[in-house]
């Protein structure tokens, strides 16, 4: 099949999307947004939303054009997300574009939230500015930028990425529970980068018991640490756990069952943890209820790191959006499988994972798939 034919606007979308990616991990619960301003086929200003509370991409692009000495009146604006029309931590971007006198605004992705949807384009059109959607390929790419934002807007729940590291025979630990390390150093470093891009990182009681993890993103450069979530079904978490060593910079959220005694939860709250109680008749239902509570905490994306019981509940819930599986060149035998739970009775009832992407990471192989798009 021949490659997609390049379009004249393609390079501008390439740049806007690249700029938007710079904000990943810092803007939530706001979406990542990039913007370029173009005149006569040349970029005269560009910007992106750096972090929550900072200038939005359109306003930064306008300021950048001015700083370069470029006139924006009559220019075309390419922005990955519909310009906002409400006042939050920043004034409306639609108003700024009207005041600047731009001639045209091309939008990569509509904003589905009630406070914004359609309002920014209406302000622009009422001011005589041409507004149009990007070409289909650019729309798809811009939507992929903000999958977490789109899912939480649609469902109130965070986008879920399930990460697993297993041996060639599908084991995540030996029969004694030893799992350090199945994946190689390159894979583990990649996971630290993913943590830095997510709002939250989660493990279950079993992983907490065996590893006492910190779940922080340990990479160079500026990092906004994710919230650390423990689905503490047994319950096992105590205030002396390693999680609490970084609580000032990385919040701790404990998801308890409705049967957990209140006296177990009081010390955790006193130590600074946020405690939410999930309800439901089975593990999958409790997982869904927990996602509702986490969404209320403005968590838009979450990396599930383990273990098999939590992975089984997540898959059974139907809430997993993406899967990242590291397969190491090891054969363990015995041990624990990557996903537990009841599972289907028939192979025909198994989950079909479409369009797997396979890439080498050090000595490991990374298999990636998107189960849902928003």
Question: Could you tell me what each predicted segment is?
Answer:
Residues 34:
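Helix-turn-helix
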Residues 26-29, 53-54, 121, 127, ...:
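Proteins enriched for Cys/Gly/acidic motifs involved in redox and nucleic-acid/cofactor modification
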Residues 15, 64, 96, 144-145, ...:
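Generic alpha-helical secondary-structure signal
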